[in-house]
Amino acid sequence: MKLKLLLPVAMAALMIQPAYSATEYEFQEMQEKLQNAIIKINAMEQVIKSNADNKSGSVKTKSKKGLTIDTTGGGIKVKSGDQSFAIGGRLMMDYDSMDSNHNSNGKSFDDTEWRRTRINIKGSVNKNWSYKATYDINSEKNASNLDEGYIKYDSKQGLTITAGKTKADMMLEQRTSSKWISTVERGLLNAMNEKVNYLVGKPGDGAGVKLGFYDKDSRISGAFSVFDAYKNDDDDDKSNIWHTTARLTYSPKMNNGFGHFGVTYGVADYKGQETKADIQLGIHQGDKTLLAIESDTGDITNIGVEAAYVNGPFSLQGEYFDNETEKDNGTKGYEWDGYYGQVSYILTGETRGYKWKSGAFDKVKPAGKIGAWELVLRYEDISVDDLSEGTVSANKVDIDRTVLGLNWYATKTVKFMANYSSVSMDNMTNEAGDTDDLDSFQLRAQYTF
């Protein structure tokens, strides 16, 4: 029986002169209480109806004053006019199985790890100013750390200014969030740029400033970044090592899909510090492989090109990078270049999301009850030429890697990934011996909110 059925009885009781002598003030007070009760009953009925219709269990409510509370994304978002506040995050649990050549002790290895356990808060003060702070509560240092934190100004007329710890603008794959990359780990190009040069990704304990621009009509965007990102915590020289990066992207609409084209540039002066080209070969829990080393690094310069095409469930993307390292005295140091190509197809018909302002891929939104299923094939190659010192036979190492992947987007927030990876290397050995063939298998369970 609905609550409203009781209202006529209550109204009738109030209209009849009570047996006791009630003042006019008391009568008016009782009427006001009844009116307030009616308002609350209406609100309760709306919430009950909303929850009954909402099969996902999430809630989205809006008051008459414009305040909305939304939990449909798994987190919580509160919005009132131009002001907003949201809490979100990501949980990624990985399983890695590797053959003996991925480890210096020459033994096969398999293990699990929490790859990322991040929680973030973000919001806006008004239509121009916003902020974000992300903490990794289970970082590699076994302590919570600030993964990202910045304030941002958006003119809404094509100009942005970001100050703090945030990603530098280089590389399509790096700009794409780890939540929405198509393979469990980003590729070898990203590893060389992020772990060796520190020209992509987020700064260590430093920060910087990024100037961005965008034009809606032409779908052209870009950014220029200057930041202190040297990550050698053992360095006694505390002077800043400034990194400068720039990126320009163009995202034209093409028939039923769209294209993506970009160029990037980065430079940094390491002031005689040591740099090492040692990376994990696509497996986060595997040992690093030392490809080259420079004890007195001067300038490091990178230039890259990127392209992608999406049409319905089909997507294609690739990048090429060239790197040159100089010694502090101006002579030539090690250099490397490489590329990758990736093709994916979503068997259930969905399309990969894309944000043209940032020039990056975004989430896949499942359309049916079985979720979205995606097949991925990737091939990449890098060559490292060490002209001075290191562990390289004949001064040159060539690495080829092939990845076959299957992704299941069970819901908008739950994702499962499976990757098989095969790596071949020329002119390279480690403590375990010959590393011509490196095979691995990876699984990931992911929840984002």
Language-model region placement:
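Gram-negative bacterial Sec-dependent N-terminal signal peptides
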Residues: M1-Y20
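Hydrophobic alpha-helical segments, especially transmembrane helices
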Residues: L3-L5, T166, L248, F416, ...
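N-terminal periplasmic/intermembrane-space "pro-region" immediately following the signal or transit peptide
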Residues: Y20-R90, R219, R352-G359
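Outer-membrane beta-barrel pore domains
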Residues: E24-Q28, Q35, K60-K62, N105-G106, ...
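Outer membrane beta-barrel
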Residues: T72-K271, W336, Y340-A367, E374-L387
